[in-house]
Amino acid sequence: MMKSSKVSTILLLLFVVIIGSFCLTYGAPSTTNQKPLTSSEKKLLNDLYDRAKKAGGVVEFKSNLDSKKFVTAQNRPYDLLALFTSSNPKYGCSGCVQLKNQIESFSLSYEPYLNSAGFLEKPIFIVILEVDYNMEVFQTIGLNTIPHLLFIPSGSKPITQKGYAYTGFEQTSSQSISDFIYSHSKIRIEPVKTFYEKYSVQILSFVVFLASVRFLITAYRKRKSPMFWYFLTILLFACVIMGIFYDFIHKPNFYEFDHRQQTYNYFSRGSRSQTVSEGMIMGVSTIAITLIFVFLSDILPNYTNFSSKSKGLLFFMGMSSIIVLLFFQSLAFQIKYYRPLFFIPSVTYHY
């Protein structure tokens, strides 16, 4: 009995020693591999840190000297989120202004992290480079268009757009910028949200609930009205068609295959041409649906000699004309993101 007790005690001690050794070896991340900063790197970090504190978060470089010193410097001891843009109407556009305003708005969320105690352990700075003052940096990186939002990691690697460019210009928000930073640096900056941003889902859900109740009451009262069901069918068709075109235009980010060059290329996302074409598609289709609805709901009932069969035939002819109209509109607006005709490559990429 004594012998078995001693064996159990020895095995328990051995188990504790093994677990303790494992915890000491793998339990905490090793900091011995972290290379200490040189005096020049510390000075560079402190200089940019002071400028960020004075600027309230976002630093705007006004000269090539500043951008060379902090952006294209060797052995950068910090990460950068750099917006390459222009306020000059000669170069800039509405997208530049919108993105710059969004970055400046994001500084409200970034400033608490800038002032936190652990900032210098994982430093990241947000900078804005205007093309008028930083042309050399634009040429060095190879930027021919604006705006560009790039994540620039610490170190001495050449700055590149591949894999480090922000692509969500159409739906830019503080949350999407925060997610972009986290995806590259694992630094989580919680965006400051307004009352509407915090509770928009709840507000929208409540509005939809009230609208649904109202619709059910109306549907019950109008259940014997043929024109109500005509209107409902048209509305359903319109929503489906609009949804198809919206989905086709906006997502996902397809590639098209160039058979001559044997390369894949992005479908164009040019904001101006896309806005014009999309607006015409949605606008003309909405007008067509409205006219047909007015005809079916107001003019058609006044003709008593029209049978229900004739009304049904006119309805389906109207809906067919809408579908044909939308198809020919898609032929008319064959910009890059419509080319070739409704061809979706077998290889697609989702971001």
Swiss-Prot record:
One Pfam family of this chain: OST3_OST6
GO molecular function: dolichyl-diphosphooligosaccharide-protein glycotransferase activity
InterPro entries referenced in this protein's UniProt entry, alphabetically: OligosaccharylTrfase_OST3/OST6
Record-level GO BP terms: protein N-linked glycosylation; protein N-linked glycosylation via asparagine
One of the record's GO cellular component terms: oligosaccharyltransferase complex
Signal sequence region: 1-27
Location of the protein in the cell: Endoplasmic reticulum membrane
Positions of transmembrane segments: 199-219, 226-246, 280-300, 313-333
Topological relation to the membrane, as annotated: Multi-pass membrane protein
Keyword tags: Disulfide bond, Endoplasmic reticulum, Membrane, Signal, Transmembrane, Transmembrane helix
Disulfide bond residue pairs: 93-96
Top-level taxonomic group: Eukaryota
Domain Thioredoxin, chain residue ranges per copy: 49-185
Recorded family membership: Belongs to the OST3/OST6 family.
Quaternary structure, from the entry: Component of the oligosaccharyltransferase (OST) complex.
Biological function: Subunit of the oligosaccharyl transferase (OST) complex that catalyzes the initial transfer of a defined glycan (Glc(3)Man(9)GlcNAc(2) in eukaryotes) from the lipid carrier dolichol-pyrophosphate to an asparagine residue within an Asn-X-Ser/Thr consensus motif in nascent polypeptide chains, the first step in protein N-glycosylation. N-glycosylation occurs cotranslationally and the complex associates with the Sec61 complex at the channel-forming translocon complex that mediates protein translocation across the endoplasmic reticulum (ER). All subunits are required for a maximal enzyme activity.
Protein name, as recorded: Probable dolichyl-diphosphooligosaccharide--protein glycosyltransferase subunit 3
Organism this protein belongs to: Dictyostelium discoideum (Social amoeba)
